[in-house]
Amino acid sequence: MIRVAINGYGRIGRSVLRALYESGKRGQMQLVAINELAKPEAIVHLTNYDTTHGRFHTRASLDEGMMHLGNDAIRLLAIEDAAALPWQALDVDLVFECTGALNDRQSAEAHITAGARKVLISHPSSADVDATIVYGVNDASLKATDTVVSNASCTTNCLVPVIDVLDRHFGVKSGAITTIHSAMNDQQVIDAYHDDLRRTRAASQSIIPVDTKLARGIERILPQMKDKFEAISVRVPTINVTAIDLSVTLDTRVDIATVNAALKAAADGSASGILGYTDEPLVSCDFNHDPRSSVVDGTQTRVSAGHLVKMLLWCDNEWGFANRMLDTALAMAATQAE
């Protein structure tokens, strides 16, 4: 049983808590504290009620600075300086760093200073972290000495399992990616100021291009893909679920059936629970609360001239990613136990 804490109780932090209670992993992981600079009443309310994922099946209540979930008591903290958090006193093995702010090694190590043994960052990180992990692809590379780890991004987790399968079966020469991403909380409800002029505009009224370093994130997990991919990203007026338009040029000549068969076999076999495959006529909301990292939409696979393949991938950018946070945390703990 590992003792964990969540720092930053926003969309991903709350999804991590819910995923822990829905995934059957509570026998392996105990949540002892949440640090969030918000009123405890608001923390409890947003645990119980969620516009995207519905009401929580376990009723949360507040009593003397503790959030109670069934028989569990979780300490609520509101401490701005991560280095001052009481992780040593609480005997915290691992911190889920979900603020979106402490994304490089130096800032994330504040949790180690505070007494935690390991940190898992819910965001792409600087190159000097001990590891960047896409669970199901490179988690076997984790070592006991890895203390500050990044869980990459939701879109990297969606793409990399698919690219890995395609490369192993057919060889990938190059690729281009467009992420069609749901709106996020760094956008505006109505027009307001932002450093990114496109993000000054109302999220519910426009398709909004944003910068992305997704291609570089792929290279970090699959070094053989260096300089082979480029990516753009647009935000769309939905609150959850992301689609990814993936185009790749393959070494091997293929057809639609061959590509889909390879991906379906992986989804049914070695990548089960991480990669999914569907040939049903589904839309984005059908993938809400889907715990997998990526689902291939086989109905949208296209092949041009035998080598250029276009595909559509789906992911719940909150729920799938939160479930991988749990998987990666347990994988980190397992290296310590070896």
Curated annotation (Swiss-Prot):
Pfam families linked: Gp_dh_C, Gp_dh_N
Gene Ontology biological process: pyridoxal phosphate biosynthetic process; pyridoxine biosynthetic process
Site (Activates thiol group during catalysis): H181
Location in the cell: Cytoplasm
UniProt cross-references to CDD domains, sorted A to Z: GAPDH_C_E4PDH (cd23937), GAPDH_N_E4PDH (cd17892)
Chain positions recorded as NAD(+) binding sites: R11, I12, N317
Name of the top EC class for this enzyme: oxidoreductase
Annotated catalytic residues: C154
GO molecular function terms noted in the UniProt entry: erythrose-4-phosphate dehydrogenase activity; NAD binding
GO cellular-component term (any): cytoplasm
TM spans (from-to): none
Binding site for substrate: S153, C154, T155, R199, T212, K213, R235
Catalytic function, reaction form: D-erythrose 4-phosphate + NAD(+) + H2O = 4-phospho-D-erythronate + NADH + 2 H(+)
EC number: 1.2.1.72
General function of this protein: Catalyzes the NAD-dependent conversion of D-erythrose 4-phosphate to 4-phosphoerythronate.
Family per similarity comment: Belongs to the glyceraldehyde-3-phosphate dehydrogenase family. Epd subfamily.
Subunit structure as annotated in this protein's UniProt entry: Homotetramer.
Descriptive protein name: D-erythrose-4-phosphate dehydrogenase
The species this protein was found in: Shewanella amazonensis (strain ATCC BAA-1098 / SB2B)
